Amino acid sequence: ERNKKIQEVKQKIENENLTSIDKKYHVIAIDPPWAYNEKGGFSSDDYDSQNNRGAVDYPTMTVEQINKINIPSADDCVMFLWTTHAFLKDSFDILKDWGFDYKATIVWDKVKMGMGRNIRMQVEFCLLGFKGKPIIQGSSERDIITEPRREHSRKPEAFYKMVERMC
């Protein structure tokens, strides 16, 4: 049942061609659907959500597929790119390939430790990148957000408030 739902979502994405956006944006926050099976971890196709904490209910993309996303960015744009330990190095490359200069890393401390192979993970990262000369409102924001995790992949409310204050 779960795999059928995932296949339906994949087909809907392909049919509706969600990459054909005709606007350009000055602020973009993106949380790519990383394919953890690439890094020896979890995959939306391989795991049953009732038996594995890491299962996801959405289709994932490879690093190569994510890198090919046509980002609808204006000439002057701020990018917030969410990533995890497994894809941190790839994320720097993707940010650059999308035309953004790396500026900082925001760390989300989820308060309680999660899963991990070599070390129990408790944080997630958000790379801040600039394209051109975007307008930023002051520099009083901190590079760490401490807020408990919520539903899978849902980012902390403090992040959205920070983006609103900055941009």
Where are these regions (language model features)?
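Class I S-adenosyl-L-methionine-dependent methyltransferase catalytic core
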Residues: E1-C167
